């Protein structure tokens, strides 16, 4: 706890760390709901393992095996008739597309994992949370600054696959 009343962040990465994929792809975060489900990815939100996913749950109808239900989100900020995809995916070899990690200004995972993006004339905060003992993934966006009207497009990338299969 700092004298000004703010909490000190212990799990925090700044832009120069996040944009360096050699560094940031090795930094992973996992959160559980205390009921068997979890959310796991890298700090730049690039799934590099078959066990990664935003909502991974045991499915009773399949013997309680864990399934990746929500793999990732494609989030696009539309500002001044320009589209900025904040996502990143890794393909065979070291090919990445889109390269939305370059818009991340800050990553913090102390209480609720959050990323702050600077995209065009917009500063956007994204927070993610799993509900305790429920198979629910919560997502909140906060517009911290927007010099002009903007739109936010969110597309879920659903998988529904066993965590051991690709």
Q: Can you describe what each PLM-predicted range is?
A:
Residues 1-166:
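Terminal accessory carbohydrate-recognition/targeting modules of carbohydrate-active enzymes
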């Amino acid at each position: 706890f700092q004298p000004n009343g703010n909490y000190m962040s212990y799990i925090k990465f700044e832009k120069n760390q996040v944009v360096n994929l050699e560094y940031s792809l090795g930094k992973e975060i996992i959160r559980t709901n205390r009921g068997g489900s979890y959310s796991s990815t890298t700090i730049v939100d690039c799934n590099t393992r078959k066990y990664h996913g935003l909502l991974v749950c045991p499915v009773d109808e399949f013997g309680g095996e864990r399934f990746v239900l929500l793999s990732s989100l494609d989030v696009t900020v539309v500002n001044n008739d320009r589209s900025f995809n904040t996502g990143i995916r890794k393909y065979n070899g070291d090919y990445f597309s889109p390269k939305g990690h370059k818009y991340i200004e800050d990553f913090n995972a102390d209480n609720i994992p959050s990323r702050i993006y600077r995209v065009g004339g917009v500063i956007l905060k994204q927070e993610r949370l799993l509900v305790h003992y429920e198979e629910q993934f919560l997502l909140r966006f906060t517009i911290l600054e927007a010099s002009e009207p903007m739109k936010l497009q969110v597309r879920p990338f659903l998988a529904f696959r066993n965590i051991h299969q690709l």
